[in-house]
Amino acid sequence: FTCNTPRRFPGPSNQRSRMTITTSQDASDVPAPDVPADARLRAGGPAEILAAADRAADLLAEGADRHDREGSYAPENIAAIWAAGLGNLTLPSGVGADLTTAARVVERLAQGDPATALIYVMHLAHLRILVDDPGGIWPVELRDRIVAESLAGPALVNALRVEPELGTPARGGVPATRGVRAVGANGQPVWRLNGRKIYSTGSYGLRWMNVWGATGTDDPDGQRIGWFVVPADTPGVEIVDTWDHLGMRASVSHDVVFHDVELPFGHAVGLQAPGAGPDPAALRTLGWISALLIAIYTGVLKSGRDWLAGYLNERVPTNLGASLATLPRFQSAVGEIETLAYTNERLLYSFTADIDAGGDRAAAAGPGISIIKVVVTNNVIRGLESALGLIGNPGLSYHHPLQRHYRNALCSRIHTPQDDVVLTATGRSVLAR
């Protein structure tokens, strides 16, 4: 790849979203206190949270078509999510929502703009890894800084893992991105990071990039693999516009290149020898991130269903004298799509309820999320294919959103774990019984 001129983006706002509360009391003109939006949602519970998500989704929907056509980042969408109090949805110090509520929020936001919802899901998932810290690997000062910035205003976090040669690390291998020990200008030890990451969801909007990389083979402690935590405005960080995908175009999942990026020594997190075993944080949060990804595509199918229902009710061919919605063929096809949507919802939210219950129930449910992902994502694609086949040319027109919903749905298969891995592992398990 050829490195283009680095492009920068505005830093995060330091103003936490707030809402003024008024009361019916005679307060003698005493000013009403300002209450942070996330505190208001925490006090209001799921009903208030989902109402905020619906309002934010309406705002996201306004620019969804334009950002899809341009393949452009939508900072106004992220700002709307934070203004609604949803930016720190799952942080205990934020809204503190459980998985079921979080998934319902994501589903609603995805009906507005699934590409923004994808960026948001990555943020929620990696904040959770950081705060849960099951392996006890995160330096407290660094963790608290990231959390504080997210609470203060849009400060997106994502992990950058995939590389041009290696592909996804979920299938094994040592990343080519290298962190090498060096001495900084102040005489203190630092890391110098070099490498290239692809499919970096959120790219221009990120404040923190958790970069999967390896130390050099000549490192005094031997080669180790882990995370290098990079503030996105660090000199040497370059974003190269390579994302020109069929779907999720506004996720701006461009390449990020690190040119001799200098990091404090404490920004290397969770380093361990190659082959030391799976990242415990990743295992613990697999159910969460998979459920939230499924929620995105559950929302995408519902968007397609709703548009189709509206179109069939409004379309009145002159030779019929009634809407297409009156014909049994169309009723049956929409019924099939609704059956798929209902199945997806039941699978997703029965799983999230199990996880929220904790204990043995959560432990028993956890491994099943991969199978649920396979079923749900294929149901979404099947449902939208059926909708396209039902109405023909109008469904493929850029004048209507159905083709966009379908293109976005096709991206569901690329998320880890992928279908072939899940089905092979499941089949092997059955055959070994």
Write out the residue ranges for each language-model feature.
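Amphipathic, small/basic residue-rich leader segments at the start of a protein or domain
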Residues: 4, 14-125
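Glycine-rich phosphate/cofactor-binding loops in nucleotide/flavin-utilizing enzymes
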Residues: 21-24, 391-433
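C-terminal helix-coil-helix/basic helical segment that borders enzyme active sites and/or dimer interfaces
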Residues: 65-68, 342-375, 385-396
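Glycine-rich flavin
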Residues: 75-83, 87-201
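A short core secondary-structure module
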Residues: 196-239
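Glycine-rich phosphate/pyrophosphate-binding beta-alpha loops
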Residues: 198-203, 292, 412-415
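Glycine-rich beta->alpha junctions and the first turn(s) of the following alpha-helix
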Residues: 245-340
